[in-house]
């Protein structure tokens, strides 16, 4: 079993924020792969399903971004899993918008949701970094991260999320390189 957690803030007013792209990725994966209905569990919302032959628990923490690790740690301990069984989808300022990178281990790089996750489960989990781009000046970061995607970005957002959902089987199989390359090919088309 694997836990795939999408980071974001709960509530409709945050739903379209760039900071919630991890939640969006989980929603698309659940829809494309026919996951079970949402249940309230582990201080958040979960959906169970299969991707290929792998059982996957999708988790959207309801703790707000800065405490995301509490929900992830609780789910990991309940299922007696290791950090290596956890994948976290989140927004990344230091990547161009709609670019995807997979990374295992490392620090938080200023991301409070990742910092919380490290605090609760350690560093050795897989991260799906979803580029949101940097606004240029540090004074504009908060407004950018907590801002909605622009109308002009909607097509790219839908295409990128669809690519994540369509290529999720490679993540389930542990083939991070194939996941990234197939997404890049889909986004170039």
UniProtKB/Swiss-Prot annotation:
| Catalysis: reaction(s) | an N-acyl-L-alpha-aminoacyl-tRNA + H2O = an N-acyl-L-amino acid + a tRNA + H(+)
Give the superkingdom in one word.
Answer: Bacteria
Positions of the catalytic residues: 19 (proton acceptor)
Where in the chain is the site Discriminates between blocked and unblocked aminoacyl-tRNA?
Answer: 9
Q: Name one GO molecular function term.
A: tRNA binding
Enumerate the Pfam families for this protein: Pept_tRNA_hydro
- Annotated residues that bind tRNA are located at 14, 64, 66, 112
Question: Keyword Manganese on this protein?
Answer: no
Q: Which UniProt keywords apply?
A: Cytoplasm, Hydrolase, RNA-binding, tRNA-binding
Q: What is its EC number?
A: 3.1.1.29
Name of the top EC class for this enzyme: hydrolase
Q: What Gene Ontology terms for biological process does this UniProt record contain?
A: protein quality control for misfolded or incompletely synthesized proteins; rescue of stalled ribosome
What residues correspond to the site Stabilizes the basic form of H active site to accept a proton? 91
Q: Does the keyword tRNA-binding apply?
A: yes
Where in or outside the cell? Cytoplasm
What PANTHER family does the database record attribute to this sequence? PEPTIDYL-TRNA HYDROLASE
Q: What does this protein do?
A: Hydrolyzes ribosome-free peptidyl-tRNAs (with 1 or more amino acids incorporated), which drop off the ribosome during protein synthesis, or as a result of ribosome stalling. Catalyzes the release of premature peptidyl moieties from peptidyl-tRNA molecules trapped in stalled 50S ribosomal subunits, and thus maintains levels of free tRNAs and 50S ribosomes.
Record's family? Belongs to the PTH family.
Protein name per UniProt:
Peptidyl-tRNA hydrolase
According to the entry, what is the taxonomic lineage of the organism?
A: Bacteria, Pseudomonadati, Pseudomonadota, Alphaproteobacteria, Sphingomonadales
Q: Which gene encodes it?
A: pth
């Amino acid at each position: 079993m694997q836990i795939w957690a999408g980071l974001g803030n709960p509530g409709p007013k945050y739903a379209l924020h760039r900071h919630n792209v991890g939640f969006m990725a989980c929603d698309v994966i659940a829809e494309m792969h026919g996951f079970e209905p949402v249940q309230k569990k582990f201080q958040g919302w979960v959906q169970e399903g299969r991707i290929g032959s792998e059982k996957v628990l999708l988790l959207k923490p309801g703790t707000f971004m800065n405490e995301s690790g509490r929900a992830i740690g609780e789910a990991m301990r309940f299922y007696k899993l290791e950090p290596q069984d956890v994948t976290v989808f989140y927004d990344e300022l230091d990547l161009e918008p709609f670019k995807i990178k997979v990374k295992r281990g490392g620090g938080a790089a200023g991301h409070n949701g990742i910092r919380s996750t490290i605090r609760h489960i350690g560093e050795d989990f897989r991260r799906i970094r979803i580029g949101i781009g940097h606004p240029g000046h540090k004074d504009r970061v908060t407004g950018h991260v907590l801002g909605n995607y622009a109308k002009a970005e909607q097509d790219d957002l839908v295409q990128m999320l669809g690519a994540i959902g369509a290529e999720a089987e490679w993540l389930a199989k542990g083939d991070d390189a194939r996941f990234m390359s197939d997404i890049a090919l889909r986004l170039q088309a």
